[in-house]
């Protein structure tokens, strides 16, 4: 199974989610699930935000080498689940032809921390971890 974490720019929420998911999967010894991340409006090649990297580093995750990536049609066909940060992301995915049954929208939605201070990114990181753990328990 492949889970793609989807946000807007792929510089904050989705790369944080990807790293957190990998950490959780490792903790749970789940080897049958892969994860990735992409943005719906990413500027390909942009680095993660400094505060996203710092918030992840605080919990032992290094996302500093991540570069933004726009969701491709190939991934849209090969991913099993699209974990959307907000209902708006889910809507865009549906409009792009992704079947509804492949879309999981975070509940509650994960607000965009872009431009916020480190505390905002910490709150985002913690909300992501809670949402990802809850989702993985459903599988």
Pin down the residues of each PLM region.
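Conserved active-site segments centered on acidic
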Residues: 1-77, 139
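Phosphate-binding/catalytic loops
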Residues: 81, 87-139
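Alpha-helix N-cap/helix-start capping motif
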Residues: 15, 86-87
């Amino acid at each position: 199974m492949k889970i793609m974490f989807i946000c807007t720019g792929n510089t904050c929420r989705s790369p944080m989610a990807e790293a957190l998911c990998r950490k959780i999967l490792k903790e749970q010894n789940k080897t049958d699930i892969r994860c990735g991340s992409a943005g719906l409006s990413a500027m390909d090649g942009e680095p993660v935000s400094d505060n996203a990297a710092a918030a992840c580093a605080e919990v032992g995750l290094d996302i500093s080498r991540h570069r933004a990536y726009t969701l491709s049609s190939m991934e849209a066909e090969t991913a099993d689940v699209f974990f959307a940060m907000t209902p708006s992301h889910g809507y865009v995915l549906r409009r792009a032809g992704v079947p509804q049954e492949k879309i999981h929208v975070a509940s509650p939605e994960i607000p965009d921390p872009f431009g916020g201070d480190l505390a905002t990114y910490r709150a985002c990181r913690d909300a992501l971890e809670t949402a990802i753990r809850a989702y993985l328990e459903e599988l």
